[in-house]
């Protein structure tokens, strides 16, 4: 069965078609398995026709679909989730990204300097040049609302977070434009003709039925590989068991990257991870317990050997804290009662996003510690001696005691002879009771993937674009080197998703679909 989808006969309102057909409309998303390239291919039960097909409904995918429809292309978006799970990782996003006061030139210089030109300078230059235009388009065309003063997504006023609100706003606008959504349809194969030109995708739903979408252009925006243990470990050389994926919904399995690799696509810094701060799994990550207990420069970090392993001021930057904490098997923070009282009376020294202001008292800190001490999943421990404290976890006790004594000597001397921490953050561990926080490194997603150029075209092994194939968001690599640049460009992952989606649609409309009217 073939279904022709065009601007003349807009099939609006078929948002849950795939999910309903599969009998899974009530499931928003589910843990998936990696794509199996050896799985037998089957004939489709239904075939669709369009100009532009997008795989993935996050920020990049929605932006690509919206811009394509605005430009007159018949557009279909397929997504592994059902309608309730639309948006993927982007549902939890907070920032859109912004252009500094110095404009495009300052943004470009900040980015290439931070990445030491490990990013693609051509891609970065166009990103900087187009960033404000795409931000304005997001606000003016899509209707996404930002908080006053910063480009943070505004909540809807009914408790829905900003990222999810932005996704729903974009989704509704896409439907108005005539974009057709096929949910519960996991893209698993990009189709090409004998000349190597992309001709569409095949998708499979949760009951194994296959559909085919024929198109002149395919944009891979499936959300990266944050939920794929094998792919994460292959690219990063970090054990997946030592990290917590805070951004994944169970469906970010690297599908876009896998499909691109099957066509011979090159990769660009696939190891680049958007790390965030250490967290206390099972506890509110924005509460006083986590922000004040495991994210402060005036604490001490210890690994499983009892060694202090860094200047704790690295916690102020997600990338530096991620880089150094990912080298440890365990991450423990040890503080004393004086520190707890200091937090309650004087506040934090390290600001974590918009949660607690530096110098603002946090009187609830002790109460949150006490509540955590009686939880069934202990992440916080209390004892009158360091020996008793360390007995609760897998840490070398003698080494820990020696490290604390050495560090206290550094405080007396006013100089950290090991890691040269700023003296203002040197604080002794000496007043009982003592507290240990057993934290774990967390990350949101990858920020590298298929190599793309300044039009979001996927680059093949011959260093030429694969005609008709695009990638965006966490499926695409080019803007970032091996790290996430949150310290100089907060929200750049969201803005990259927007810009890369916009680029793909613009290029496809101008180069691949000549029938479009000017």
PLM ranges: what are they?
Residues 74-79:
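Short beta-strand "acidic-cap" motif of Rossmann-like dinucleotide-binding folds
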Residues 41, 80-180, 184-189, 301, ...:
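Conserved N-terminal/central alpha/beta ligand/cofactor-binding core
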Residues 257-259, 266-392:
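An anion/pyrophosphate-binding glycine-rich loop and adjacent beta-alpha core
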Residues 209, 214-280, 490, 494-503, ...:
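Glycine-rich loop(s) and the adjacent beta-strand/alpha-helix scaffold that form part
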Residues 46-58:
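Beta1/beta-strand and adjacent pyrophosphate-binding region of the FAD-binding site
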Residues 1-17:
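N-terminal secretory signal peptides and thylakoid transit peptides that target proteins
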Residues 130-211, 216, 228-232, 278-281, ...:
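Conserved redox-cofactor binding core of oxidoreductases
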Residues 189, 399-483:
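A glycine-rich dinucleotide-binding beta-alpha-beta segment and adjacent secondary-structure elements
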């Amino acid at each position: 069965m073939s279904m022709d989808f065009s601007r003349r006969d807009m099939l609006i309102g078929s948002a849950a078609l795939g999910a309903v057909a599969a009998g899974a409309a009530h499931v928003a998303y589910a843990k998936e398995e990696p794509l199996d390239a050896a799985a037998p291919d089957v004939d489709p039960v239904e075939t669709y026709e369009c100009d532009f097909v997008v795989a993935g409904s996050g920020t990049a995918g929605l932006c690509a679909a919206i811009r394509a429809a605005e430009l007159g292309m018949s557009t279909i978006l397929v997504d592994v989730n059902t309608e309730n799970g639309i948006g993927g990782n982007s549902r939890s996003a907070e920032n859109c990204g912004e252009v500094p006061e110095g404009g495009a030139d300052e943004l470009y210089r900040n980015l290439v300097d931070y990445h030491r030109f490990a990013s693609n300078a051509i891609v970065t230059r166009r990103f900087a040049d187009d960033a404000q235009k795409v931000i304005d388009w997001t606000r003016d065309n899509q209707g996404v609302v930002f908080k006053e003063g910063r480009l943070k997504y505004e909540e809807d006023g009914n408790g829905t977070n900003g990222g999810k609100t932005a996704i729903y706003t974009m989704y509704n606008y896409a439907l108005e434009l005539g974009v057709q959504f096929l949910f519960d349809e996991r893209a698993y194969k990009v189709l090409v003709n004998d000349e190597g030109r992309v001709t569409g995708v095949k998708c499979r739903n949760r009951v194994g039925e296959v559909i085919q979408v024929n198109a002149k252009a395919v944009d891979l925006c499936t959300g990266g590989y944050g939920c794929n243990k094998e792919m994460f470990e292959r690219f990063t050389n970090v054990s997946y068991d030592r990290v917590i994926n805070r951004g994944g919904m169970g469906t970010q399995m690297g599908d876009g990257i896998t499909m691109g690799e099957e066509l011979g696509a090159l990769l660009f810094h696939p190891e680049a991870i958007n790390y965030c701060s250490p967290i206390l799994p099972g506890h509110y990550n924005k509460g006083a317990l986590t922000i004040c207990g495991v994210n402060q420069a005036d604490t001490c970090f210890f690994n499983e050997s009892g060694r202090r392993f860094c200047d704790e001021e690295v916690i102020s930057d997600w990338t530096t804290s991620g880089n150094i904490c990912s080298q440890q098997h365990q991450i423990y923070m040890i503080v004393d009662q004086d520190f707890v009282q200091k937090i309650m009376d004087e506040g934090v020294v390290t600001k974590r996003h918009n949660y607690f202001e530096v110098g603002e008292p946090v009187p609830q800190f002790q109460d949150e510690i006490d509540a955590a001490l009686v939880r069934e999943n202990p992440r916080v421990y209390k004892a009158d001696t360091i020996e008793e404290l360390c007995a609760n976890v897998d840490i070398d006790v003698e080494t820990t005691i020696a490290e604390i004594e050495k560090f206290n000597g550094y405080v007396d001397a006013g100089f950290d002879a090991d890691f040269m921490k700023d003296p203002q953050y040197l604080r002794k561990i000496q007043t009982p009771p003592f507290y240990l926080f057993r934290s774990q490194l967390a990350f949101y997603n990858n920020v590298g993937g298929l190599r793309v150029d300044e039009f979001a075209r996927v680059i093949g092994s011959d260093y030429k674009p694969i005609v008709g194939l695009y990638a965006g968001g966490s499926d695409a690599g080019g803007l970032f080197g091996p790290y996430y640049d949150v310290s100089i460009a907060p929200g750049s992952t969201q803005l990259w998703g927007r810009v890369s989606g916009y680029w793909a649609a613009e290029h496809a409309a101008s180069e691949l679909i000549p029938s479009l009217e000017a």
